[in-house]
Amino acid sequence: MREINVSEVTSTVAKLCMDSCYYLPEAVKAKIRAAAETEESPLGKEILNTLIENFELSQKKAVPLCQDTGLTVVFLEIGQEVHFVGGYLYEAIHAGVSKGYVDGYLRKSSVGDPVFDRKNSGDNTPAIIHTKIVPGDKVKMIVCPKGCGSENMGALKMLKPADGVEGIKKFVVDTVRAAGPNPCPPITVGVGIGGNMEQAAILAKYALTRQLGEHNADPRYAALEDELLELVNKTGVGPSGLGGSTTALGVNIEFTHTHIGGMPCAVNLNCHQARRAEAEI
């Protein structure tokens, strides 16, 4: 059994919040640079070059990539041999989010009641936390700030087995086409297939934590990722939704078992700033 004081979790989460909002992952930067070289639309190329200038400035000055620093989504993998001491784990995570957003001068975008009061919490808490227990004595944390422009354009469809792979392709492409400029393309497309209604949605979100360029380990789904990326880019939505050949930088699929009578499919979109930061304790 390994003991970890939750104060270490708090400080780690605070740093990840700031890092994820300031520094774009290298894989994302490489994809945007490559897209700027191959984009067919002159306006689209100009937009992509502006995105490059933006992430270079944010890294140089340690300032947010975007004013929408999102709700904080935390994916936790906790080794079953870990024992947390010094407080409650989730409270420690929320404290880390608060510290990161206050100390990092990040916009606070969380309201407590979604319908009536809609009062801002003032520190971007609470975080949205997904926890998985794994073998070992380590704790892995992935922090993904998620803005609402892209989040609002996600979709879920309870497909039937008879819809098959063609039904999945149509749903994904239709979702991207309907989203248009709203998710700030070029986007990353997270697709969750299987499970039930809520698991498909979580899988789609989790798919966005995978580094751009990393394919699903199953070659069938890896091939589907490539095919979907090609289909999405043929929509012509383009950078900022103003037309062009670069609508998406990547498509990531996660899948799991499901009921014999169903094939749920969820799509979660990231904007061109596929923000993430991770650490292990």
Which positions does each model-derived feature cover?
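Non-transmembrane, aqueous-exposed alpha-helical and coiled segments at domain scale
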Residues: 1-281
